[in-house]
């Protein structure tokens, strides 16, 4: 959501580099290339998590299996969901026009706030008008 917000502000200010900013967001995958996709965490005990904030969700241990085997194992429903999250998103995230770039923002925050990792990110500061 941060990248989208920045892009919208640049458009609002008619900044000459707004288009280039958008192209970089698309190239990098924005927030959609985050937890469980482009980010992982291995804690001091060797446990693998979707990122450093998912400490309560263990995908495996690198002392027992190679990281590559853990990271490419599609048996974990949360990891599979994080990698294919768009159809799972609910609420305003499900209808947000920026979901391809934002990726529903921070899924662990949604989980901690609502008990549902696919619920809207409660910290999304984009207005309803901005996401419509």
Over which residues does each language-model region extend?
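A cytosolic small-molecule/anion-sensing beta-strand core signal
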Residues: 44
